[in-house]
Amino acid sequence: MSKQNKKDWKKFRDEHKEEHKVENEILEEETDEESQHQEPALGHPSYTALEEQLTLAEQKAHENWEKSVRALAELENVRRRMEREVANAHKYGVEKLISALLPVVDSLEQALQLADKNSDPSMHEGLELTMKLFLDALQKFDVEQIDPLGQTFDPQQHEAMSMQPAPGAPPNSVITVFQKGYKLSDRVIRPARVIVSTK
């Protein structure tokens, strides 16, 4: 090899050495950056700790979700219960007042039965009119009279005072009404007191 060729070769080799050195430095820097950004290996302690934290966070999130669902359900139940109580208060709010007025109605009925039409017809007429006004006023508040004479005995609406044989009457029917009953809407506030026929 000639001297010129040796010089050229040496020059070429030195230039490439410098290039390789720069390339290697760049590669090392890139490798360092990549290794810093890589996730830890599956068995690495920090990876296991992160997995445990994630599992705990998921469990806590699920517990909180269940609590919120239960709280919403409870809130809905409270809302419905309050609506029902308000509706019942509107519907049955006058029950105590009606119960207090029922003895007055009973007294008017007894007075009508005892009053002799022949002795004082105007008094009898006045009692009838008062009784009608009273019953009309009760109807405005959805109060209904229970007068079960001749009907089959119903323990939901009638109170049997006694039972006795009654020829010609079907068994288990009301043959005498001692005291009429009353209902407020669909609720019995006083059952009718009756005598029931036997077989």
Curated annotation (Swiss-Prot):
Superkingdom of source: Bacteria
CDD domains documented for this protein: GrpE
Region (Disordered): 1-52
Major subcellular location class: cytoplasm
Compartment annotation: Cytoplasm
GO biological process, one term: protein folding
Any single Pfam family the record assigns to this protein: GrpE
GO molecular function, one term: unfolded protein binding
Keywords: Chaperone, Cytoplasm, Stress response
InterPro entries: GrpE (IPR000740), GrpE_coiled_coil (IPR013805), GrpE_head (IPR009012)
Keyword Chaperone: yes
Basic and acidic residues bias: start-end ranges: 1-24
Chaperone in keyword set: yes
NCBIfam families named in the record: PRK14139.1 (NF010737), PRK14140.1 (NF010738), PRK14144.1 (NF010742), PRK14150.1 (NF010748)
Protein name: Protein GrpE
Gene: grpE
